[in-house]
Amino acid sequence: MWHFRLVKGESMLPSYRPGQTIIVSHSRCFGIGDVVVVFMQSREALKRITDMKDGKVFVEGDNPDKSTDSRQLGWIVDRHIVGIVTWPKKKLKGRW
């Protein structure tokens, strides 16, 4: 199952811009480098998985100056991942 979402905020610039349409799959098959919708701080946010261990993920925005993420909040339980962005796929150059 998948659904359309609109990107909100600037935390994923330059990969994803505010107002851009994305397709999110409810797949549980995600890994390092994937962009996911994750439930954190009582809301859903778009972030990139940068590390995984013991059922937890470390997520970061591509734009660190505009992102509240695991760098401030710590590891996130992976069951808080709502889905994975399946389109458009954007890799951060030089990292994944």
Regions found by a protein language model. Name each.
Residues 1-96:
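Extended hydrophobic leader/signal-anchor segments used for secretion and membrane insertion
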